A protein has these predicted regions:
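Acidic, low-complexity central loop/insert segments
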Residues: 58-110
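Pseudouridine synthase
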Residues: 118, 125, 157-201
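Helix-hairpin-helix/helix-loop-helix acidic hairpins
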Residues: 142-159
Length: 283
């Protein structure tokens, strides 16, 4: 069984919990996921099954989109509402101040990963150090906020934001920084990933739906999966003749092929996806 299963991750599950559950449902250990989600977060988690797992590191679109809730009045050690409160302060700002500062967070910037993260220093994840009460210096990393928008206030001192950003962005840190720019203490009280690359909430299935499909048979389960070719939809398509197909399977370079320089997704004459090909015309 091969394909990409877009899972709607439930809250209080780690991304690895989802993989472990799917290994039981699908009966295979050959699974990989793209973009770890914190346990409190929900939403889009692409899982690559079988041979499709080779495509995890080949994705072309690494942008992510989120819907997050900023809660003013307190700051926690984890940057979200699951953590221990470190500071509290009266809330003296609101919607106006939020709207004033949001434009300043759009664009390329440097962001320091939080201690409660999977980033490794000297081979050890930061979150393990944080649990021992150890804090170490972390290097800021380049990120980009492509879009950020205020969506409303679900409760007093809470503000819902939608964010589209580059890979590696920590929304918890972003919300803390937004609160600080407002002159407030703040933390993230909810987070949902609404898209990961090409994949959106509309593509996602709950674990219950996946299990129900499995009980109906492999055909129903495979119907939930997206083809591995979907990862490369933005690449131009190249349809090759049988002799070229055989060359590609054998790992042989093929000369004199009528296509411009570049990277292509390749199908055979029957429409079967074969893989990727790089064409370079020597001068």
């Amino acid at each position: 069984m091969q394909g990409i299963l877009i899972v709607d991750k439930p809250t209080d599950w780690t991304s690895f919990d989802v993989i472990a559950k799917l290994r039981g449902i699908l009966g295979t250990r050959k699974l990989g996921h793209s973009g770890t989600l914190d346990p409190m977060a929900t939403g889009v988690l692409p899982v690559f099954c079988g041979g499709a797992s080779k495509a995890v590191d080949l994705q072309l679109d690494h942008t992510k989109a989120y819907r997050a809730v900023l809660r003013l009045g307190a700051r926690t050690d984890t940057g979200d509402s699951t953590g221990t409160v470190l500071e509290t302060a009266p809330v003296t700002a609101g919607e106006k101040e939020l709207l004033d500062v949001l434009p300043h967070f759009i664009g390329p910037q440097m962001q320091t990963p939080p201690m409660y993260s999977a980033v490794k220093i000297n081979g050890q994840p930061l979150y393990k150090m944080a649990r021992q009460g150890i804090e170490v210096e972390r290097k800021a990393r380049p990120i980009e906020i492509l879009h950020i928008e205020y969506e409303g206030s679900p409760a007093e001192n809470e503000y819902t934001l939608t964010v589209r950003c580059s890979k590696g962005t920590y929304i918890r840190v972003l919300l803390e920084d937004i609160a600080a720019a407002m002159g407030q203490k703040g933390t993230m009280s909810a987070l949902r990933r609404t898209s990961a690359g090409l994949y959106t909430e509309a593509d996602a299935h709950t674990l219950e739906e996946i299990l129900a499909a499995k009980e109906q048979g492999n055909a129903a389960l495979e119907a939930l999966m997206l083809p591995v070719e979907s990862v490369f939809e933005s690449l131009p398509l190249l349809v090759v003749e049988p002799w070229v197909e055989q060359h590609l399977y054998n790992g042989c370079p093929t000369s004199r092929y009528p296509a411009a320089d570049g990277r292509y997704r390749v199908r055979n004459a029957e429409g079967q996806f074969l893989g990727l090909s790089l064409i370079h015309i020597s001068e």
